[in-house]
Amino acid sequence: MAATVNLELDPIFLKALGFLHSKSKDSAEKLKALLDESLARGIDSSYRPSQKDVEPPKISSTKNISIKQEPKISSSLPSGNNNGKVLTTEKVKKEAEKRPADKMKSDITEGVDIPKKPRLEKPETQSSPITVQTSKDLAMADLSSFEETSADDFAMEMGLACVVCRQMMVASGNQLVECQECHNLYHRDCHKPQVTDKEANDPRLVWYCARCTRQMKRMAQKTQKPPQKPAPAVVSVTPAVKDPLVKKPETKLKQETTFLAFKRTEVKTSTVISGNSSSASVSSSVTSGLTGWAAFAAKTSSAGPSTAKLSSTTQNSTGKPATSSANQKPVGLTGLATSSKGGIGSKIGSNNSTTPTVPLKPPPPLTLGKTGLSRSVSCDNVSKVGLPSPSSLVPGNSSQLSGNGNTGTSGPSGSTTSKTTSESSSSPSASLKGPTSQESQLNAMKRLQMVKKKAAQKKLKK
């Protein structure tokens, strides 16, 4: 480049240098004329744009010089003024560039004018070669280095090259394979272990590099180990704490089914119409139909009638001996015996006609029909039958009342036999129906205590 430019532009450069460094007033006009000649000839048209692009800052300095020195010329040539200024700057730059090559000529031309004009020209001549050299040299160095390294670096930055060999070359059996986890590219041969054809070509498979597979295995092991240790502990602790709480209520429920607190069963009532004592038998059968809490309340209220019954029996023992009901078979006896098949034994206690103090219709005891509560009073003439049993169906064993209330019940011998039969009949019924209300209350208290103890133990453990 430099040699060809020197051959073409030597005379113009010499003239331009002479005009620039001369002290005469005509130098500016001569420079302008030279510029017009070069424009007319069209020489160096290919070289101008590159110089314009490389060094625009010199335009301002030459503009100032040309405006100061040539106000007349610039006014006379308004159309070509801008082009003239640009071309003069180009000439100055060209001269500065060719100075090292043409030292002899420049020294001869400058020898006369250097002491007179050092301030105006030297800053331009010193600064221009520095800027031109740096821009050109740096540009060339950057281009060469960019051509050598930019492709690889760009490929690495964009993630288009192999991470191992840092190259983008792809062969038929050595394609670039991308890891789905870290998105790094590997040649099939560069990766260890080498990628198989199936892994590289099958689109259904997801390929991971060796480093990512190791990391994923470690993470999987870490995530699997912690739940394995506490899981058995939780399983072992929960049954120990919860099993007694879960199982015991089940057993309690089984026990409670035998004692239904809020269930009211409708039992067939034995309606016996036998003279004056019909109301007593009906009331006793109605009260005996209660079960659960109602029967428990009836039990508590039975204390009063039992005392009345005691007094009546003592007076009966002092009175006249009564005829046995086994010999007398009144009309109402068979009806009572058959009615006892309905599930309730009727209990009617009446006194002798000779005892004036005791009323003919004593209040019926409320404990009738209650299992486990058929306890006979000492030497009384009242028979208590809990459930329909074969012994209660026999008319000779159970003492019943006839229509008037005048005939008395059996004596001590008859009462004892009735007691034994009633006890024997009540014992299977008690075993069938399970615990009484008192026992169920005790069981409930025990359960409450157990629950409280367990709650306290849980609090202590926490």
UniProtKB/Swiss-Prot annotation:
Dephosphorylated at Ser-128 by the PNUTS-PP1 complex, promoting RNA polymerase II transcription pause-release. Residues 347-358, 396-437 have a biased composition (Low complexity). Residues 59-86, 301-328 have a biased composition (Polar residues). GO terms for biological process: RNA polymerase II transcription initiation surveillance; snRNA 3'-end processing. Residues 42-129, 301-462 are annotated as: Disordered. Pfam families: PHD. GO terms for cellular component: INTAC complex; integrator complex; nucleus. The keyword Transcription does not apply. This is Integrator complex subunit 12. It comes from Macaca fascicularis.
